[in-house]
Amino acid sequence: MPGRLQRSAALAFALAVSIACGESERGPRTVGSDRAGSPVRVATAAGGGSPAARLYVWAGDVDRADSDFLAVLDADPASPGYGSVLTTVPVGRRGTHPHHTEHRLPAGAILFANGFMPGTTFRFDLTDPDEPRLLGSFGEAAGFTWPHSYERLPGGHVLATFQGTGPDNADPGGLVEIDDAGSVVRSASAADPAAPRALLRPYSLAIVPDLDRVVVTSYDMGEDMGMRGGRRGRTHVVQVWRLSDLAVIATIDLPLQPGGGGDEQPGEPRVLADGRTVLVSTFTCGLYRITGLASGYPGAEPVHRFDGGGCAVPVVRGRFWIQSVPNAHAVVALDVSEPAEPVEVSRLELGARSFPHWLAIDEGSHRIVVADRGDGEERIHVVLLDPATGALALDMRFRDPGSDRPGVSFERAEWPHGATGPARPHGSVFGPGPR
């Protein structure tokens, strides 16, 4: 019954929003209503703060003839230019396959961004939001190669996953702590003598300072990209590390979901609002809770299975887990108040041309940026989360100037840095405006 009431409240929110904004029934919609749109105002997050005024989008030139770049968009919901592209920062390299950035803009405003194909991390200085600078880039770190994901430690350094070692990208990879200048602080291998056959390709991570733990997923992105070197294949393990000395505590084989499957290609771990519970989503749409995380014998249990057959990047806000499900063309919200029994409360379908992949949340409001997987339309959207019910609705005001469609298209001929043609957006992060 609680799940039914939550879903009803979410659908009521979406219906009220759609009536206010009048989006066509043929456009994106929240399941259970005929229409979806965005509220007239953007609610600020609990605990104070203001909505972000800038959105940084890491993008790759589609035909690889010109430089990849970081785009800066007007994300101030009170601005008449909301959704406009303000400036761009070319990195002077093409075909890098711009991939993950950090999920939140760090306090020091130095952003790490991944160009996966050459195994490169780019560092951007965003202290002046409207005049960002490329500080430089680096490849290997402490012998580890092909970096993927970045999370900030309590002291401000980055803890990064690296998929492999050496120029051939051989497994296992590892974790590397890096300062804002790109210098190595410490590092450790993902090798585990207790799991000699496990394919250990560190992909993403969740840091749990209260428990002195790091949860690390293993997924071989290089296999999907056609890379050679080391062992390749589909993975099904998650590791628990001790944060204080970067030691592997356990390598966990994910169990099958009820009915089979869902355990392969572990993707993204996230810490819930209590600061101690970690859920892990897989690219095969399983959702798992890490059990016994504070102990020396952690495990994993299946708690949910998304439909669609392919899942991607989640975010957490309060008691809600928001998941991109590209194969269902949808973003889905779960109530995870009871982590062992998540309840779906809302679903926003973005249409057949959308394969939502990357999500990141505005810490000063309840807005979520959505970037496509790369095989759909080159467009980013902003989705609004109702913090009381978990209802999701499309922000209809976030659009190209003069456009009759929500979202900002990256399928354009001109950019501030030149006529370089369409670009493919991926990692995106909200940030403040000029002071």
Language-model regions, residue ranges each:
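Blade-level signature of beta-propeller repeat domains, shared across WD40, Kelch, NHL, RCC1
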Residues: 366-367, 371-435
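Beta-rich, blade/repeat-based domains predominating
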Residues: 46, 92-106, 141-153, 195-212, ...
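Beta-propeller domains
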Residues: 200, 205-332
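Asp-box/WD-like beta-propeller blade repeats and closely related beta-sheet repeat scaffolds
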Residues: 126, 131-209, 218
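Loop/turn-rich, solvent-exposed surfaces of beta-rich toroidal or solenoidal domains
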Residues: 307-383
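Short, conserved, GDST-rich strand-edge loop motifs in beta-rich repeat architectures
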Residues: 50, 57-64, 160-173, 216-235, ...
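Short loop/turn segments immediately following beta-strands, especially the blade-tip
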Residues: 72-81, 123-132, 180-183, 240-247, ...
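Blade-loop segments of beta-propeller domains
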Residues: 83-152
